[in-house]
From Swiss-Prot:
It holds the Pfam family MscL. This is Large-conductance mechanosensitive channel. The lineage of its organism: Bacteria, Pseudomonadati, Pseudomonadota, Gammaproteobacteria, Alteromonadales. The chain crosses the membrane at residues 9-29, 79-99. GO terms for molecular function: mechanosensitive monoatomic ion channel activity. NCBIfam families: mscL (TIGR00220), PRK00567.1-4 (NF001843).
């Protein structure tokens, strides 16, 4: 039973939950970027390069024989995946850069010392009066 309690304590910690949310959002963001690259970026690039569909670019190593499909190196899909990765990596870099900038600004702004309480003010006045009496 203690194993279950330990797991609940582990899973309910803020860092684990934040990580899970990050993974889910990251997966969704990856799908969005993949669609953006495949459906928005690559078609115009293909038109510019003479009507090339990048997802179809491949080198046939062995032609199809009977029921066996052909063996190919699909380098067009690889190019799309590299572009996906580059966009995702750049977005993560920009996000981390923004977070680091905000953290630096927080660190640079020194906190004002807290105002003295009434007790501290009274004690300071008493101290000053005692010093004045000793000097006489």
């Amino acid at each position: 039973m203690s194993l279950i309690k330990e797991f609940k304590a582990f899973a309910s910690r803020g860092n684990v939950i934040d990580m899970a949310v990050g993974i889910i959002i990251g997966a969704a963001f990856g799908k969005i970027v993949s669609s953006f690259v495949a459906d928005v970026i690559m078609p115009p690039i293909g038109i510019i390069l003479g009507g090339v569909n990048f997802s179809d670019l491949s080198i046939v190593l062995q032609a199809a024989q009977g029921d066996a499909p052909s063996v190919v190196i699909a380098y067009g899909k690889f190019i799309q995946t590299v572009i996906d990765f580059t966009i995702i990596a750049f977005a993560i870099f920009m996000g981390l850069k923004a977070i680091n900038t905000l953290k630096r600004k927080e660190e640079e702004a020194p906190k004002a010392p807290p105002a003295p309480t009434k007790e501290e003010e009274l004690l300071s006045e008493i101290r000053d009066l005692l010093k004045a009496q000793q000097e006489k």
